[in-house]
Amino acid sequence: MTDTPTKQEITSKNDKVPGAIPGEQKKNNRNNDRKRNRRGDSKNLERDSDWQERVVQIRRVSKTVKGGKKMSFRAIVVVGNEKGQVGVGVGKAGDVIGAVRKGVSDGKKNLVRVPLTPNNSIPTLSKGRDGAANVLIRPAAPGTGVIAGGSIRTVLELAGIKNVLAKRLGSKTPLNNARAAMVALSQLRTHKSASRERGISLEQLYS
């Protein structure tokens, strides 16, 4: 007469952990997954909290289609972490919130890393141009502040620059000025990198 295996013996053979009940093991696995997801979400929130967003302009725009005019919103957004990274983005959507959200996403895709000096200024003078807008930025002494206006000021502040002089020439369009400022910031080089590119020492660079 053969012995019939008990329920406990069957479950112990099927489970990875001997003697464990399948339902309890699945429940423990789900709890562990939730804990890992929470830890991952908290890290993402910490990274996102370092970034700031400022809306430079929101305009209502229209597009002529076959059935008439299609209205939408365009948002110009500047994103930065005030630690040397900044970006300008443009978003279009049927509502303002959607346009701003797309602008933030576009700005984070076009980030520029800015070399900052110990007194939160820029190392050298720089120029940038976008369309008919020209922007000139130059370093300033500690305590000067951000001497700039419009969208240029927003870009410089979110980049983490606290002492700088900026001058706008040509077009007054917020988007062109913001992009011209981005071009000027992207051309900045530290003193060491400038001397390395030119193949001379720091003493020869300033002699």
Curated annotation (Swiss-Prot):
Presence of keyword Cell cycle: no
Alphabetical UniProt keywords: Ribonucleoprotein, Ribosomal protein, RNA-binding, rRNA-binding
Annotated Basic and acidic residues bias: 24-51
GO MF term set: rRNA binding; structural constituent of ribosome
GO cellular component, one term: small ribosomal subunit
Chain positions covered by the region annotation Disordered: 1-51
InterPro entries: Ribosomal_Su5_D2-typ_SF, Ribosomal_uS5, Ribosomal_uS5_bac-type, Ribosomal_uS5_C, Ribosomal_uS5_N, Ribosomal_uS5_N_CS, Ribsml_uS5_D2-typ_fold_subgr
Residues passing through the membrane, by range: none
A GO biological process held by the record: translation
Stretches assigned to the S5 DRBM domain: 51-114
Family per record: Belongs to the universal ribosomal protein uS5 family.
HAMAP family xrefs: Ribosomal_uS5_B
NCBIfam families reported in the protein's UniProt record: rpsE_bact (TIGR01021)
Function: With S4 and S12 plays an important role in translational accuracy. Located at the back of the 30S subunit body where it stabilizes the conformation of the head with respect to the body.
Subunit details: Part of the 30S ribosomal subunit. Contacts proteins S4 and S8.
Domain notes: The N-terminal domain interacts with the head of the 30S subunit; the C-terminal domain interacts with the body and contacts protein S4. The interaction surface between S4 and S5 is involved in control of translational fidelity.
The name this protein goes by in its record: Small ribosomal subunit protein uS5
